[in-house]
Amino acid sequence: MKKFSLILACLFLTGCATTNMPSYLQPKKPYIKRYYSNYDKTLSSVKSILTELGWGLEEATDPGVYEHTRFNDLDENKLLLVTAVRPTPMLVGTRYARMNIYLRSKKEVSEVEVRYLTTTSTALNNFSTYNNDGAVKRFFARLDEVLPPVEMLSK
């Protein structure tokens, strides 16, 4: 009985860690790829692939709202897609994931940049990582089937 009371008291005193998932993800580990495709075709392909992979769109906005200093040679048409937070229950806590997809296009070349944030929430702490190679590779592999890639860029 004493052990149970001690465990219960510890759980009561520790509480829960609060998880806050930002809409805008910093460019800590971006994945970038260029395609021979115009803006409209790239946008429709990206949206359909996100839906196919189980991601919901929360917001579509101009990236200039969040980033003012970045310049790219493909800045004629640009858009930031923010996915909805995707929770995954785990044994110890819950993992929350979100993606930002940046589209930059000029004429017949489009650049797709994916930023991924995973936050694992446990009773005591939150752990965040800015990459998920497997999920992003699945996204780009599916996009490669639809659009012809130019080259892989790394930063």
What is the predicted role of each segment?
Residues 1-18:
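Sec-dependent bacterial lipoprotein signal peptides
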Residues 17-155:
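Ser/Thr-rich, low-complexity intrinsically disordered terminal regions
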